[in-house]
Regions:
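Acetyl-CoA-dependent GNAT
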Residues: 3-9, 16, 21, 25-31, ...
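Active-site acidic-Proline motif in GNAT/NAT acetyltransferases
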Residues: 117-119, 123, 151-152
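Conserved beta-strand-loop-alpha-helix junction that forms the acyl-donor binding cleft
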Residues: 147-157, 174-179
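Short, structured active-site-proximal loop/turn typified by the sulfatase FGly-forming signature C/S-X-P-X-R
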Residues: 164
Length: 195
C-alpha cells in the first residue's frame, strides 16, 4: 500500500503542499537499501566517538541485508519505508508480537526501529512513519506500542515525548559484553476495528 502524506497532516497541522516523498510497505527488494540506510543512521547516532571493532561487528551482525531479508518475510514483522524518486529516506520496523515487562499491560507491539537519514530529519518523515507504525500496530490488535531508545539519544527521547510516549524505566542493550542504558517508552493505542 502506498500512502502519500501531506505536509503537516501527520501532526494534525494545517495541510500544505504535497511532499515529494511517500510511505509504502517494504518489499524483499528493499533489503539491500534498508541494510545500508540502517547502518548509516546507526553509525551517525551511536558511533559518535568513531568506529571500533565492537561497534563494527554489531552493525554488520544486526543490519546485514540477510537480517532485513529475513525480517521482511517474518509473519510478526512490518516495515514501512519513506521513499522519494526510488531512494529510501527512512523506515519504521515493527515487531507485532514483542513484549516488554516495563511497558504497560495489554497487547503490545514494539517499534524496533524508526530511522531517518540525517538530511531528511525535520521533513516530517519521522512523524509520518511513527503515525503509520502506530496505525499498523493498532490494526494488528496492539493496545500499547513501546520502544527502547538509547538514554543519550536526546533528540529521539524528545521526539517521542512530544508524540505522547511516556518513560517506564531503564533497560539495558548489551552487545560484545558492553551494556548501554536504554529507556522503555510506551504509548497507549486505540485498537483499530480492523484488529
Amino acid at each position: 500500500m502506498t500512502l502519500r502524506v501531506l505536509a503537516g497532516e501527520a501532526q494534525g497541522c494545517a495541510v500544505g503542499p504535497e511532499p515529494d516523498w511517500f510511505l509504502r510497505a517494504a518489499t524483499p527488494t528493499d533489503a539491500l537499501c534498508l541494510s545500508v540506510l540502517a547502518m548509516q543512521v546507526f553509525l551517525d547516532t551511536y558511533a559518535t566517538q568513531g568506529i571500533r571493532p565492537a561497534i563494527a561487528r554489531e552493525v554488520l551482525a544486526s543490519y546485514s541485508q540477510e537480517v532485513f531479508s529475513q525480517a521482511l518475510v517474518a509473519h510478526d514483522c512490518r516495515i514501512v519505508v519513506a521513499e522519494r524518486s526510488g531512494h529510501l529516506l527512512g523506515f519504521a520496523q515493527l515487531q507485532l508480537t514483542a513484549r516488554h515487562e516495563l511497558a504497560p499491560a495489554g497487547a503490545q507491539a514494539e517499534l524496533l526501529r524508526l530511522y531517518v537519514q540525517e538530511p531528511f530529519t525535520g521533513a516530517q518523515l519521522g512523524t509520518a512513519l511513527l503515525a503509520r507504525a502506530e496505525q499498523l500496530a493498532s490494526e494488528h490488535g496492539a493496545a500499547v506500542l513501546w520502544l527502547t531508545p538509547w538514554v543519550h539519544n536526546h533528540r529521539a527521547l524528545a521526539f517521542y515525548a512530544r508524540r505522547g510516549y511516556t518513560d517506564h524505566g531503564a533497560t539495558l542493550f548489551t552487545f560484545e559484553g558492553e551494556s548501554h542504558e536504554n529507556r522503555v517508552l510506551a504509548k497507549s493505542l486505540e485498537v483499530s476495528s480492523a484488529a
